[in-house]
UniProtKB/Swiss-Prot annotation:
Name by which UniProt lists this protein: Colicin-E8 immunity protein in ColE6
Organism: Escherichia coli
UniProt xrefs under InterPro entries: Colicin_E_sf, Colicin_pyocin
Domain of life, source organism: Bacteria
Protein's GO biological process: bacteriocin immunity
Keywords, in A-Z order: Bacteriocin immunity, Plasmid
Pfam families attached to this UniProt entry: Colicin_Pyocin
Length: 85
């Protein structure tokens, strides 16, 4: 999957695939690193990769829970959300 410039360029479904690729360690080491760095960059969430590897509270580490956490944090901090579609 081609990585996009910002979180607003992704639908939730598209971004879920990136999270699944990270969780499942898909691709070679460089691809895994690129996906993780991209996740951290576009989400802008202060917990970064901990959202996946060390989830807290109601986040069970599933792709759906990670997306929910990102959406809630971005909305609470006046940041744009995912592309509709």
């Amino acid at each position: 999957m081609e990585l996009k410039k910002s979180i607003g360029d992704y639908t939730e479904t598209e971004f879920k695939k990136i999270i699944e690729n990270i969780i499942n360690c898909e691709g070679d080491e460089k691809k895994q690193d690129d996906n993780l760095e991209h996740f951290i960059s576009v989400t802008e969430h202060p917990s970064g990769s901990d959202l996946i590897y060390y989830p807290e509270g109601n986040n069970d580490g599933s792709p759906e829970a990670v997306i929910k956490e990102i959406k809630e944090w971005r909305a609470a901090n006046g940041k744009s959300g995912f592309k509709q579609g």
